[in-house]
Curated annotation (Swiss-Prot):
GO biological process, one term: glutamine catabolic process
Name of this chain's protein: Glutaminase
Family: Belongs to the glutaminase family.
UniProt KW keywords: Hydrolase
Reaction it catalyzes: L-glutamine + H2O = L-glutamate + NH4(+)
Known partners and oligomeric status: Homotetramer.
Residues binding substrate, per UniProt: 70, 120, 166, 173, 197, 249, 267
Naturally occurring in which organism (per UniProt): Mesorhizobium japonicum (strain LMG 29417 / CECT 9101 / MAFF 303099) (Mesorhizobium loti (strain MAFF 303099))
The keyword Isomerase is annotated on this UniProt entry: no
């Protein structure tokens, strides 16, 4: 992975990418199955980078909060691994699904064990793990405080309207939870696990805040500003591996091919990207492609990675 000698050009690269994205008209379609997300202006675009030497660089609408949705699953996985360790992998797999993120088909064939922690079923199991010994409100608070701690920003909130919108329309997620409960892979009532799930998906963050929160994954598990160890270096690598192979649902292979870094997307249009040893990246453009990933966000990260010669596959 290239070192930071190229990073002085990073602010220029971000500005160039943001300017190019502003000119594009093929922006994808905003998610409408969660009604609150359908109200977001598709013309928005923001991008941020936080380097391991402490610089915070932004362009476009990088300080406007958006619903991080499935990007939150990176942080809930981190918390759950801290709570139960590798026992977590007895209840959720580590393989790409090859199916839509809310598919119920594989659960039937695989006895209620979700393929990975980033598809909806897997994230519901992670929420169930975080419920152990807690009321839903306590588990939700723990997740929010953890993300605030990582970002060093206690202004990050949960958008209650988005959470309510998800609960009111989340019939497929209720089906997934009940199906896993029937296999014994939920230890709490489905509605409790789903309450945690809907609320952590409704966390609102800006690109700047999100890139700050992801710093530890780019720095061997440590907060580069304080040296505080969030996770071990090995666990940071493994979370990064999950992001690379499963972070974009059934578009994960294409993202790895085109961009070449670990990333996690959300249907709110955000993507968290990790350049190990260099920087944490966040991009937001609400319009989605056919796989439910940010269309311009993916294009922007591909362009940025090419400009900066970033890839985990580079010598």
């Amino acid at each position: 992975m290239p070192e930071l000698e190229r990073a002085p050009k990073l602010d220029q690269a971000l500005a160039e990418v943001a300017a190019e994205m502003a000119e594009r008209t093929d922006r994808g379609d905003v998610a409408t199955y969660i009604p609150q997300l359908g109200k977001v202006d598709p013309r928005k675009f923001g991008i941020a980078a936080v380097t391991n030497d402490g610089r915070v660089l932004v362009a476009g609408d990088a300080d406007q909060a958006f619903s991080i949705q499935s990007i939150s699953k990176v942080f809930t996985l981190t918390l759950a691994l801290g709570n139960v360790g590798d026992a977590l992998w007895q209840r959720v797999g580590r393989e790409p699904s090859g199916n839509p993120f809310n598919s119920i088909v594989q659960l039937e064939h695989e006895n209620g064990i979700p393929r990975n922690p980033f598809i909806n079923a897997g994230a519901i199991v992670i929420s169930d793990i975080l419920l152990a010994g807690h009321q839903p409100r306590e588990a939700i608070g723990e997740i929010l405080r953890f993300i605030q701690f990582l970002a060093d920003d206690d202004t990050i909130i949960i958008d209650r309207e988005v959470a309510a919108s998800e609960r009111a329309t989340g019939y497929r997620n209720f089906a997934l939870a009940n199906y896993m409960k029937s296999f014994g892979n939920l230890h709490h009532a489905p509605e409790l696990a789903l309450g945690v799930y809907f609320h952590h998906c409704a966390i609102a963050m800006s690109c700047r805040q999100l890139a700050m929160a992801g710093r530890f994954l780019a720095n061997g598990g440590k907060n580069p500003a304080t040296g505080h160890s969030v996770v071990s270096a090995e666990r940071a690598r493994r979370i990064g591996a999950m992001m690379l192979t499963c972070g974009h649902y059934d578009g994960s292979g294409d993202f790895a091919f085109r961009v070449g870094i670990p990333g996690k997307s959300g249907v709110g249009g955000g993507i968290l990207g990790i350049v190990p040893g260099v920087a944490s990246l966040a991009v937001w453009s609400p319009g989605l492609n056919a796989n439910g990933n940010s269309k311009l966000g993916s294009i922007a990260l591909e362009k940025l990675a090419r400009m900066m010669n970033w890839s985990i596959f580079a010598p």
